[in-house]
């Protein structure tokens, strides 16, 4: 036994070493982080019979998980998504059973479609560019970069001040994010803007001192024509102050009603002198004009400050006049066409202290404003820029009663990438409010403020607005309708392990996951298999929305998977089938021997006939011997012989089978099961209250070994403990293999004992009849001994296995009693870094190999040790279990004094042959190993013979050389 065990241990050590190398190779693959799933030692309810599994997967918005290499023009390569793999399901690697509860939380943000420039935008409308207002010169739609894309600049739209109408900058659906910014006022420099329609850069001169500018300069003016810049006092400018001419009548004037009221009489020389009206020549302040707008100055002297009140953004220059009615020139008559040319705004325009000449020192000179700038003259926003939301996106000129003036968002909300290296703004955000509305769709519109009554075609300049938009934005797994129903819902299907829904060609029925505001949800698996997931999106138009999608979700799984029962899944089906077949075979043997209820006796032999003949022969022989005096009988012998005759004659009864089947058969065959179940404290009863499986005590340990994902992860995590972990793994792996082999041997012994017991009971009528004669009595006695032996042998064997199994379970929990996570376990660092690079770079890993590792272990703080004494105890217990199986067989043989084959020997041979069959697949069975060692031995012997032959030839050669040398010396 010891030699066989050593051989088995050697084979297991080799297998364990090979497994280590295999997992080392897998560890290199593990350098790529595939998740952070954890296998918890206990579930949340503290139940150790379940695997508490946590896992995290990354769910891509584009549903593409395959990258290919693309050659760039500069000769380098870049990984890009495979263009043929969009919209695919992702295997989460979470295995569930039917009705298993799964908790999950979806975290992250995705954009499930790409925003494009809308029609009737700031730069072109359908009137100015029919059918192509949203297309570039090549006829393609113009994509808008996403808000979170810090590496892509926004697209720029040129707002011409000549367009005094509302135009669209963005088409918004529910939850869309938008970032509108304004380009700065380019002062004393050139401005350069990308024209997204032409695909070229536009550069214009924006230096000060000009009265007209291109829209990209960041300034505009609504003023044109002439305005009053100074007032001049013009003497004798007009005739006013009307009065009558002085009368020189000698005798005075007389009053006549039929003519002028006052006249001179005919006697006076000056006729009608009193009827003439005369005017004085009066001065007036006249206007001095200049053209609007005044040339722009960078010092802001002609620039409006930002205001959210339109009255502060307009100066009515035509209302400013040096004097009343100054726009009506004098007609040179008396009186003038107007009678009031008094000063009006002269003091404001020319100044109070100026009383003659050209006056231009009034406060007006400092308050002249003509220009609106994108920087708002240091104000809160771009001056004169207004916005509104419009549900249909139509172009219009009407101004609402309340104007919304654009403002700069707070400094803390300005993206850092919108500044240059000197901290100067390239773009300044004026709108960043997500679109949250009950309206399905709306348009964000902008225009430059100007009076609606004014001819905007005379305006000059403009602004440049820049737009980023994240369309179809969803977060934490929430979904709602835009142009596609339920876009963004996380869906799942449960597929068998052998299927791939992306290639199977089958039609599946995805289930949608309803999450709360935090992205949490719960569902029960509708079938068994692996969970596959993807984010619902519009599959039309050749998966365009999937291809345009960006972002990902982190899906955190938490589920408790009941560990598969070794008893229910393996032992019950095996034993129930085997025991049923064996019991049926045994009862068939019994029935065929007695032809029980047989209508056709040709298929059976009625053993009752032989028993009757034997019984008659026995009575006749013994009676004749008694009458002839050859046999002496006393009372004891008489009772014994009568009892024998009674027992044997009882077999002749037609109800013999019912008696054996109802009372003796089950009692004898289930004797071992009852004792084993009572000893272990575990039992599994059928509907008839009979014990169907005596191996319930193995359920915990074997279920853990064969069906627990947590246990497999715990075992593999030993490899993460360094070189000592490899030793721990090999020793633990060998111990577990020994326990598995021992368990299989025990099951084989039980099966053989049960089968032997059933067969012996089945042929009971034959051996009971051997009770009559002394020369056949030994056959009956041996039958009884072997029946009892096969009934007791499993009991004695299981008694020790039960105790050792419980000990093994305890120590296995000592060794592997921790939760496990997939994480960084083996950091790869540059060797000798301290002698080459600064000490600051010490202990900095280049990359890390991920593998299963105990919960809480940090590779930076050192490895976690395992108590070696527990591992040694584990091996000792496993070795004891292996040896006890054979030991129990010998014990039972001594107890029952039954020489011959035992169930232990037969079961051992069965397990040995099964093991050799498995090992033969990898060339490690006994015959192959014997062949290898035989061939190696043969080669070694051949080598030794060759060396001996070479040595002999060498000696002969040296001897011959010596002889020749001696001969030459003698000569």
Swiss-Prot record:
Leader peptide range in chain numbering: 1-24
Residue ranges the record marks as coiled coil: none
Highest taxon above the source species: Bacteria
Biased composition (Basic and acidic residues): 938-954
GO biological process, one term: protein secretion by the type IV secretion system
Keyword Transmembrane: yes
Subcellular location: Cell membrane
Membrane topology: Multi-pass membrane protein
UniProt-annotated stretches for the region Disordered: 127-146, 933-971
TM stretches of this protein: 611-631, 721-741, 753-773, 795-815, 832-852, 865-885
Keywords of this entry: Cell membrane, Membrane, Signal, Transmembrane, Transmembrane helix
Any one GO cellular component localisation term in the record: plasma membrane
Keyword Transmembrane listed: yes
Family: Belongs to the TrbL/VirB6 family.
Protein name, UniProt field: Uncharacterized protein RP106
Natural source organism: Rickettsia prowazekii (strain Madrid E)
